[in-house]
Structures are given as structure tokens and as C-alpha cells.
Amino acid sequence: MAKKVLLLSLYSAVLSTWFGFGYVQCKLPTSRSEIPNFDYTVAQQPDQSDACEQNEVCMVSVECILDAKKKAILKPCSTVPSVDGVCCPSSEYNGTSSRVQQNSEEHAADHLVLQAIHEGRREYDEKLRFEDEHRAVMTAKEKPEAMFHRMFLPGGLKTHGKEVVDAEEQANVYGHVFASRKYAELTNMTLKQRQGDRFARIPRAIRKRCLPPVPCNPHSRYRTIDGSCNNPLPDRTSWGMEGYPFDRVLEPAYEDGVWAPRIHSVTGNLLPSARVISVALFPDEYRPDPRLNILFMQMGQFISHDFTLSRGFTTKHGQAIECCTPNCTAPLFGPHRHFACFPIEVPPNDPFYSRFGVRCLNLVRIRLAQGPECQLGYAKQADLVTHFLDASTVYGSTNDVAAELRAFQQGRLKDSFPNGIELLPFARNRTACVPWARVCYEGGDIRTNQLLGLTMVHTLFMREHNRLAVGLSKINPHWDDERLYQEARRILIAEYQNVVYNEFLPILLGHERVQQLGLADPFDTYTNYYDPNLRPMTLAEVGAAAHRYGHSLVEGFFRFLTRESPPEDVFIKDIFNDPSKTLEPNSFDVMMFSFNQQPMEQMDRFLTYGLTRFLFKERKPFGSDLASLNIQRGRDFAVRPYNDYREWAGLGRITDFNQLGEVGALLAQVYESPDDVDLWPGGVLEPPAEGAVVGSTFVALLSAGYTRYKRADRYYFTNGPEVNPGAFTLQQLGEIRRTTLAGIICANADHKEDFYQAQEALRQSSADNVPVPCTRYDTVNLGLWREEGF
């Protein structure tokens, strides 16, 4: 039976962290040839004066970007809140801008920079002229119907099937990249210098190209929608906001040190085709997990969409780019190939695509971002959502989207009642769904309709917001719509963060690892996790590889259970971007109960054909291949080989495939050297670490990512009022900490008296996790939010 689907994330038209691609579907060939004042207590910061030297910073090990060998000789220390750490040299601290400071001391004459910028812009303008001349061939012919582009255009940026493009911003970003190449050539920079971002700063005369600071109110009780002003320091107000670039654990492997993707083996030959690797390493086999359910997989996708979204490059007119011939019989070459094309070649003997004459899978390189440093440098991919765990999937990452989702009554979000139960609001623009879908919804994220399970998790948190807003309005009838909306949002984000760090991560990374890193939260006590020097930026290695672990967890079907009928299996290949089944009676309760009971797939090398053959197939006999897209996207991002991250994580390098046993034999079938193995397949093939879902390399990378999401977030829900101007009272905090995902589900079930929910919502029901009536679950006591004196 076919296997998995999910955690789609980065796309090539949208990065996300689970599905990653920038894909325009091929035509079917016609023949086989074709802050408040209240009492509080705070976890005290330990005295570090005797532990670390003046030029060192005490931090959790994953925050220090040194590799494991260098970390091993660092002096131990105790961080806030009393977590074992290391004394990391401040120049190696990921949260500082040490590279920029060093670069500014090594900058060349301004005239060389100006010359490079001039020539870079001229080169970009020439490419645009070339694009105009060959637009008929370079652009997709099925827009706006082509699902693979349509679904990636963020809400509010669509106009008649085309994306609104800020031409000047795009010219600055790509002119900057071409200028960096020119500068590297003019100054004879080595590849190591380029990959280390040792470029010159931009002269003051033209620094209008640099990102300006965002004006902020450092005492705002509520976090902004777009993630700005989380860090109120003058030069850091844009840190972590939507559109900010990804960061990295290791330097990128751009072959020219600037933007050329990683395509060569260490032997000098070309790396194997991503599709060849997919076929050899990721077959379909039904292997259900014995403990965890589909809801764990689906929450993983929902969480990943909160901090990862990218889209592929488009023409200056906002049109999707085509990198394959119309019938996908070959990649485009020569004058017809757009400079942002990075298609996947399919061999003629492919066991599936050869039936349709497909020799090319379309993929366009991810759009780049203006970097925060006012300097030339290598390309940095744009993340189009906030870099925080702030439920942007519910509220959006821009003020325009947030406003569109609000009812502006009683603090509520918009909803709909097409079958008598509360569902998401109908989308004004149905291009996020297949044309034949009977309904299409709108949420805070453009991928809301991708999978039924994802749509229902969006529905769950929309319902929870509205439940909180209505409850607060009854307790505080004098509050206006804005206050009710912001307070309900503040509580929901806290509930969500509590679920992520205290229910989801202990399963994903292992309880021991979560405790060791200080990722688990205490009850009824404030913390001071916040580190203003740590940049809240999603790691490219997490978005482009590690958080795509979830593709292995996806089952090829959803099994819906009701008392009145036998189980119904709905195959994911038939319902991508089609949430029509939500219109059936009692759909919310039926689906949420079923997700609790159905096992997810095991974390292993087996992927459902629903993802590797039929991804977004619409009504065609074939779709795309998510495994191939993941591998190619990692190369687009210039993520370094798997071996480099093994070494960074302290596992040691592999020098012979035989060191990995059976897995090594599989890898040797497609790779020439252990140093060629791509990060995503290497990480997926690792056996799970003790107590974790994923292997040790992904545990290390995900730990680094989730440490940032907590320690670089001033508004993290357990931070006290000396840090967080929107801190909860201790009584409120304790109430939130006792909230569970099971309780949230029960609070929003339509028929609570008939709904049974196990306490551990991410695990299958069992003798140790028996479902009990929802009437036994307590909800958040909103009486603690009553404003006295009114």
C-alpha cells in the first residue's frame, strides 16, 4: 500500500520545509515519445565571571558554530537557565556579526566595489533583456491553471495568475549577486574567501541598497505580525521578520563561492541525477510506526510552515519559469534556458517516468533576499514567513494578510459554516486549490489546502483563537475588538509554543536531548532564555534538509473512521489541494479522531509513491517526485555534503561506504565518494537516535534550529517581564503550561459528549494511552485574564 505525504516545506516555488520545489507541470505527451506590573520570580542567571574569559560567551553548545573537535576542548560553563554550555569564542558566535566586522577591516578600495556593482547590474539587465526576447519559451504555458506555480504565490500577491514583482528590489538583490561575482574576479578572491563571505562593504554613497532599520516600540505588549521589532536594538529590529534571509550552520558550497549550485563530485565528475538517487534509495513500502500517529506527522508539517516558506524565481512580469520542453521530454538549453533554471534530468530507463516519455522535472531556483549586512557576499535565500514560532500559519506574516483574516468583531478570525460546523473562511482567490475542488479555504499560510490533515490543523487553531476571543469578551465586555484579538492571539501563540516544546520536540528529538539543551519549560516559573545577540534566523540546513524528515512519515492515504460506516481510505495523490471532503457531515470530529488512531509511517528510507511519483499530479497520470526535489533543492541552496554535517555534529566523517553497512552499500550504488552524499538522503538514511524519531545528524541540526526559535525570541511565552513586555502572570503561565494538544482538540470538538481523546495526542491510542471523553478535559481558566476595576 502506498506510503506517505507531508511536511512539505520549502518549495521551489515554496520552501516550506516540507515540500520543496518550483514546479510547473508538464503537458501530457500525445505519444510515448513526448509588559504588566505584577509580582514574579525569575530563574536567575548564574555567575559566569569565573567561567569564561572576556573574549568568550557562555552558550548552549549548538549555538557555537565550531565543529565538534574544537568544541571538545572548550571550557564548560552554565548558561541561563542553568543548562550545561561551553565558553565559545565571541568571533565564532552565530549571533554576532563578526564576519562583517572582520570584512570591514579587510575591504578593498571603494572604486573596485563600485565597478563590480556597475558591472553586476549591467549583467542582470542584460539577462532581463534576454528574458524578454525568449519569454514565449521560458514561461509556463498552463498558468494560471498550473498547480505547481499557482499554489506558491502568496495571498495578496496575485493578479490574474501573475505575481506582483518589486522590480527594483529584485534588481538590487540579483545585481548584488552578480556584483559579488565580479568583485571576486577583480580581487582574485579564493573559493575559501568567497564561501567564508570575506567580501568588501558597500561604500556609504550607495548604502541605500542596504536594509534600513524598522522603527519600533520596545515596550509593545504584543509581537508584530511580520516578526519585526522582536529585538528592539536599533540595528536589529528587522532580525527574524518575514523576507529575511536564511542563516547557516556551515558555509555554503556554492561552486563559484557566490551562487553557482553544487553539481560536481569531489572526483570532478557531475553528481548523480537527483531522480536516479530517488529511485535507488527511496522505494515505497508500507511500514507503519508502532507508536506515533498521523497527527504527529501533520503537526510537524504545520510547525515547519510556521518558519519556512520560499518561492521560485519568476520573470520580471511575475510569470512562472519553464525549464523543460512542453512535454517534459528534455531540459531546455541554450538561448531558451532561463538563468534561474535548475531542472532535474530523468534517465531514459526510469522505471516510472519512461512510460510517459518524461526526461525532465521542472525546478526553478529559490528567490534570494537582500542581506542584513551592508556588503557584497554570497547569495542568501529569502524566507517569506517570520523566523519565529509565532503561529504565522494562523495569523499570516504580513499586516495585509492578517487584516484579511480578521472578522473585526469580538476579536475573532473569519470563519465559515458550509455544513453547519465552523470551518476556515472561503478563499477569495481559488487558485490555491485544484479547479474542481468544491471548496477552497484561506488561512495564514498559502499552503493551507495542501492536505486534508493540514487543513484540519489550521481549522483547529482558528477555532481555538475564536473560542479564546469569545471567552475573553464575556469576561471583559469593555475590551474592544483590537484588544480581544491581540490577547487571544497572545494566548494561542503561548499554547502553541507549549505544545511544540513540551509535547512535540521531546518525541522528535528525545526527552533527554530536550532536557539537556534546556528546551523543556518549567511549570509556574519565569525563565530568562532570551539572548539579544542570537540572530533569530531559520537555518538553511533545517529548511532545505533536516525539517524535511517528515516526508518519510507520510502515509499514502488517510483512513477515516466513523461508527456508522466501514473505514474509508482516501489516497493523498487524489486530494492534493482539494479539501472538498471537509464539507461532509461532522468532518472535523471524524478527521481529528481518525488522525489520532491511524499510525504514521516509520522514519526510514521508504517514501510513498504519492510523493515520489504523483506529487500534485492533478488529473494527469503522473506528478512530480518530492525526493528528487528535496535533493535538488539542497544543491540549489548549496547545502554542504552530509559528511560535513556529520563532522559538525560530532559523529566523525565517513571515509568508506562500508562504515555505514547496508546503508553504505545503498549509497555506493549512486555516489562516487562518501564526500558526495547530499545532506537530505544521508540524514534520512540514518537510524533514529536513541529516544528520537530522526537520526543523530538531524537531531543536531534541528536542536540548533529550535534553540534559536526559543532563545532568540524576546516574546517566548515563559520569559518574565524583565525581558518580555507581554509576559503572563505566574498564574496565567501555569494555566498555559497545563494546556495540552489533547485539551485543545477537545475544547474545539463539535460533539464533546461523544468525542474521545487520548491524553498523549501525538501517540496512537493504546492500553497506556486510552481515549477518554472530552468532558474530562479542563480548558484554560480565562478568569485569570479578568481585568479588575471594570
From Swiss-Prot:
InterPro entries: Haem_peroxidase_animal, Haem_peroxidase_sf, Haem_peroxidase_sf_animal. Its EC number is 1.11.1.7. Binds 1 heme b (iron(II)-protoporphyrin IX) group per heterodimer. The modification N-acetylcysteine is found at C210. Its main location: secreted. Extremely resistant to denaturating agents, such as SDS and organic solvents. It comes from the Eukaryota. The keyword Secreted applies. The modification 3',4'-dihydroxyphenylalanine is found at Y353. Residues 1-16 form the signal peptide. Glycans are attached at W259, N327, W479, W680, W785. It catalyses: 2 a phenolic donor + H2O2 = 2 a phenolic radical donor + 2 H2O. N-glycosylated on Trp by mannose and on Asn by N-acetylglucosamine. There is a hexose glycosylation of an unidentified residue between 654 and 708; Trp-680 is conserved in closely related species and is probably mannosylated. The record marks R447 as: Transition state stabilizer. This is Chorion peroxidase. Keywords: Acetylation, Cleavage on pair of basic residues, Disulfide bond, Glycoprotein, Heme, Hydrogen peroxide, Hydroxylation, Iron, Metal-binding, Oxidoreductase, Peroxidase, Secreted, Signal. PROSITE patterns: PEROXIDASE_3. Heme b binds at H551. It comes from Aedes aegypti. The keyword Flavoprotein does not apply. Its cofactor is heme b. Residues 17-209 form a propeptide.
